[in-house]
């Protein structure tokens, strides 16, 4: 079995972290937790 290069391992780890953060952000923005978010423009009607 061949060993993988460190650059490939680091790039896969960074890609996984970015995809996880993106998924968490989409879930927070559009999923069930979005009901708790406030709209600052609605709070400050002029």
Swiss-Prot record:
BP term (GO), one: photosynthesis
Gene Ontology CC entries for this record: plasma membrane-derived thylakoid membrane
Protein location: Cellular thylakoid membrane
Alphabetic keyword roster: Membrane, Thylakoid, Transmembrane, Transmembrane helix
TM ranges: 10-30
Membrane topology term: Single-pass membrane protein
Entry-linked Pfam families: PsbN
Family to which the UniProt record says this protein belongs: Belongs to the PsbN family.
Function: May play a role in photosystem I and II biogenesis.
Full protein name: Protein PsbN
UniProt source species: Synechococcus sp. (strain RCC307)
Record gene name: psbN
